[in-house]
Structure formats: C-alpha cells, structure tokens
C-alpha cells in the first residue's frame, strides 16, 4: 500500500485549497470542494475493506453507489488543508444502498464532510449525465 500523502489527487486538492485561500476566493470556511475519484486512482492508497466509520448522508445517493470522493470537512479552513490534510479532508465512498458515506481516510479529529455535501452529490449526479468526464464541484 502506498502512502496516502504521496497520492497525486491528494496533492492536487491540497494545492487547489491553498491557492483558493491565497487568492482570497475562500476566506475562513467559506468554500468547499468535492472531487470525484476513479477507483483506480485510490486503490493503491486504500484498503477498500477498511471502512473507518459510516456517516449518514441524509438522502438517497444510490446513483453514486461505490464512487469515491475527496471532500473538504465541515467548518474547516482552506488555509489549513496543506498543513494537515488528514484532519481537514476526508476520502469517502458512497455505500451500496446510497444512504451513507463510508469514511476511508481523513477527518481524523472525528470531523465529517461539509454540510453542503448533499448539494455537491446531487450536482455530481446531474453533471455526470451530460459529461462523463466531470469530476469536481467547488465554490
């Protein structure tokens, strides 16, 4: 298993968060990112059988069942992501029944995904219907 900190998708997310903060686009905890990852991107870095915990989604996301997302945490600041990604980000997989996020990595302080994740996931569902290469929602 490769070290998660060496994953290109994680480093891209850390750089994006740092740049958005540096440019003043997301002050304090004013923005969020959800990055849809291909299973092949994550398989070298995760034990797919090791679910750290389940976090209820509060809606039916079955359409995204089995999909992986790297997501900013609730109440987290973009400026802190690069220094401590494992606290400020989480890598989740949508459960088979679409009711939960299976935490695979991150949110090590007991945190959870942004409260806006349902809106992000609904946006991903809609965009994927018209663009199969779609992979990010950010604001």
List PLM regions with ranges.
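An anion-binding catalytic pocket shared by soluble metabolic enzymes
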Residues: 4-134
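Conserved mixed alpha/beta catalytic, RNA-binding, or beta-rich assembly cores of soluble enzyme
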Residues: 137-138
